[in-house]
């Protein structure tokens, strides 16, 4: 699929002009920047030859340090040294586990977490922007000029708020974002397209703070994400914490450590973990205690976490409708996949040796660089189509508190879907649009994303207006919703930016609940639909009685209809679905003759004074 070259008038790039673009892997623990140079994609190093940049920012009174310089301050000045900001991206303060974190948290008016530093309050978006600036500077220096665009990778399960936060950070850093790219998809680009493979690929991505599993199908240059899963709060940092707790116990320390000591302990644990990648026994010393840590002990500590990742793999395969044997290749991504136990268990689960030929720390950045090179226009003849998916269905609330799905779960993006809705009452001039996310049938069981109101609808009979509601999810997974009344053209639109993110555990809980309550939800939906129909019938009959009851009905006939209305209202409040349906049918039967008389009266009124020959 050749990409169209589009530019502002007078700014068209010459065909031979090579644009500067980089791919950025904005990680929880470390970040990287990569670029395609002379047709080869590779990571870019700093002046000391290091390609990894610790995702750490240290705030001084008159300066901001990023990377290795900041990391050295983590144990000396933990209150002003922000690590793992990615874990907080797009979340409300109430959703962040602040225990064992050395920061002073303050909630902003919108619930966003803010951290008190020497330079005042900063939020995760601002912290991430500093990291992106540093990486962009490295990219510009390596490529010889200002960058024309960047592709930034995010975990597959980042929701709207987390993705928007990432884009905001890039904008704050002065970067032009070509696209946000799912990390597993980036890894598949680096492996799959370079080697020309086709088939089903599993991408196992275990980084410092997040875990993602993606099942992708690659066919004739088309990547389709068949299913995704993972845990946005599980990674190598958690391995460090488990080992740190063990070391702390061996050192005879109890209670909560001060921030500086806790940071020093985590650094010791991380060093031991790295040593155990190649050795069976690693010496360890902390707080006066000296000893050794064996690989066997470390593996015992982390086995429950590794099992959690494999359960997510099993769920993703089930969602894709596949068995392990149907997976042709398993791509390992993230520094934590260097742990021998992880590689061993993943190999056993998928029944094949995982691919590790590309450095697991670099593979995502390399894939992002390849994609950036294409999107910026350096490879206009490149053929590549990436089809990511949305993790939960998107829809809106209809009468009776029902959730009407507009875009089902696992739909590939970008996507736009539209449905038509109508008014419920005569003369209705406005409609409230409530956007929801989830798999349940009732709005009360789904997650509310946004609300807006379409006003200026021309007054007309109930059901006569045609309101077209369009849901659009762009290539970055960001949602916009618009509503338009077709006869008048009045419209309203909203960009959905939730105030906080949705964690992987929340998503799994929502999916599990939808399965466990499927029959109950459907029963509740059918009941709500009948209740809405009962309301419509009662309102319609009352309006008809008010207009023509005295003129067209006898006292007995009116009493019968009034009795039917009372019965519908009574059953609607406490009856079953079938009882409400029977009451509505009974009311229709009793009022049928009245409806016919009203129709005759309307026809006579229209024909009054008309020449028969003209009718």
Swiss-Prot record:
Top-level taxon of origin = Bacteria
User: Keywords for this entry?
Assistant: ATP-binding, Chaperone, Nucleotide-binding
Protein name per Swiss-Prot or TrEMBL: Chaperone protein HscA homolog
A Gene Ontology molecular function term of the record: unfolded protein binding
Query: SUPFAM superfamilies of this UniProt entry?
Result: Actin-like ATPase domain, Heat shock protein 70kD (HSP70), C-terminal subdomain, Heat shock protein 70kD (HSP70), peptide-binding domain
UniProt-listed Pfam families: HSP70 (PF00012)
- Matching PANTHER family, A to Z? HEAT SHOCK PROTEIN 70KDA
Q: Give the organism the record lists.
A: Aeromonas salmonicida (strain A449)
What is the gene name?
A: hscA
